[in-house]
Amino acid sequence: MRKFLSKEYHRTNPLWHVYRLVKFSKVFKNVIIIEFSKFIPSMVLKRHIYKQILNINIGNQSSIAYKVMLDIFYPELITIGSNSVIGYNVTILTHEALVDEFRYGPVTIGSNTLIGANATILPGITIGDNVKVAAGTVVSKDIPDNGFAYGNPMYIKMIRR
């Protein structure tokens, strides 16, 4: 079950009010850092920037590949466990804007987890330990430990250990 907070805007597009929820200066800083960091080849330097400047909780030996797009409004709501791999061009969102509602929530990715290339993780999602997410999957609900998620819409199979 996705866990997120919600702010309703009746008959108004919430993106017109977004800077009432998040300071423009914070978003501007996050955009610069995230866009710059996408192209850093050093995992050590990239992890340091994400942990120290964006306050993302990243476990030991986890790697974030080239061109990964992190949420620009609330990157501090992202947690990645130890020894996990976030593949090429993955998008991790902690917010979503609907026609009349703005939602945001934490994203937690467990340890020893692989997120395949071009996957999208929606806000409020928890992905367990030892999970494999196939390339191109839209993660729209929680995935338990030892799961294998694939497709759009997403299907989950359990991996026997």
UniProtKB/Swiss-Prot annotation:
Enzyme class label: transferase
Question: Highest taxon of the source?
Answer: Bacteria
GO molecular function term, any single one: acyltransferase activity
Q: What EC number(s) does the entry state?
A: 2.3.1.-
Q: Please name the InterPro entries in this protein's record.
A: Hexapep, Hexapep_transf_CS, Hexapeptide_acetyltransf, Trimer_LpxA-like_sf
Spell out the PROSITE patterns in the cross-references. HEXAPEP_TRANSFERASES
Query: Which one Pfam family would you cite for this protein?
Result: Hexapep_2
Concerning SUPFAM superfamilies, the annotation shows: Trimeric LpxA-like enzymes
- Disulfide bond residue pairs: none
Q: Which UniProt keywords apply?
A: Acyltransferase, Repeat, Transferase
Please give the family membership noted in the entry.
Belongs to the transferase hexapeptide repeat family.
Name used for this protein in its record: Putative acetyltransferase SAR0816
Gene source species: Staphylococcus aureus (strain MRSA252)
